[in-house]
Amino acid sequence: QRGCGRSTPFLELKENNIFYSIEDMEKIRLHIGIDKWTIFAGSYGSTLGLTYAIHYPEKVKRMVLQGIFLANEDDVKWYFQKGISEIYPAEFKIFKDFIPKDEQDNLLEAYHKRFFSNDIKLRNEAIKIWSRFELRTMESEYTWPSEEEVQDYEISLALIEAHYFYNKMFWNDSEYILNRAEIIKDIPIQIAHGRFDLNTRVISAYKLSEKLNNCELIIVEGVGHSPFTKK
């Protein structure tokens, strides 16, 4: 993905949105010389994979997805405003209280503002709070890192997420995937989703599966978001 991991330039947000990403996928397919491929993806990867399939359905043989994330307005509000706050109240309080009270009605906007502040100390502290809140709520076994310095993976996680979510995924439709599911309804799709996934809600997987003709939805009891959970 552009701007993170081993991609260069690191943290580059110019020409960095989901539509550039699906074109990058298509370039890879053409470069390798694959006619039709299987898309295997989870979490935001499912968002990207589904968006790719909507644009290039004839190039997708089948899909194996985990942790469906539709990236709609409800998904973002659930995580960063009200929803998960009722399950992780102490962790959310740290996340919320970093922002002044007069800005707490829109925490995404408030954090986005700080991530792109010229005040590097403020920016890094905001990034640390955001990324560690997210990692802590992803799996209950996660422990808060002891490092005082913000890590590169935390910077890219926070800035790129906020860039996408603040700009509503660069879509012109909050329900971009569901409203275009007709295009991919006959592609063989298998979905595994943890019943207690608090990051990507099981309702999203269910709603998507209801719009598909050739979908197998497997709800895995007793697990959350991570595909590496031992059960």
Predicted features and spans:
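Glycine-rich "HGGG/HGxG" loop immediately N-terminal to the catalytic nucleophile
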Residues: Q1-N16, D74
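Conserved acidic catalytic loop of the alpha/beta-hydrolase fold
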Residues: F19-T38
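Short beta-strand immediately N-terminal to the catalytic nucleophile in serine-hydrolase-like folds
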Residues: I39-A41, Q66, A192
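Short glycine-enriched nucleophile-adjacent loop
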Residues: S46-P57, M63
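A catalytic-pocket lid/entrance helix-loop region that shapes and gates access to the active site
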Residues: E58-A110
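Conserved alpha/beta-hydrolase "acid-adjacent" motif
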Residues: N172, L198-S204
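Short beta-strand/loop motif that positions the catalytic acidic residue
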Residues: I184-K185, I191-H193
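Catalytic histidine-centered segment of alpha/beta-hydrolase-like enzymes
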Residues: N199, V220-K231
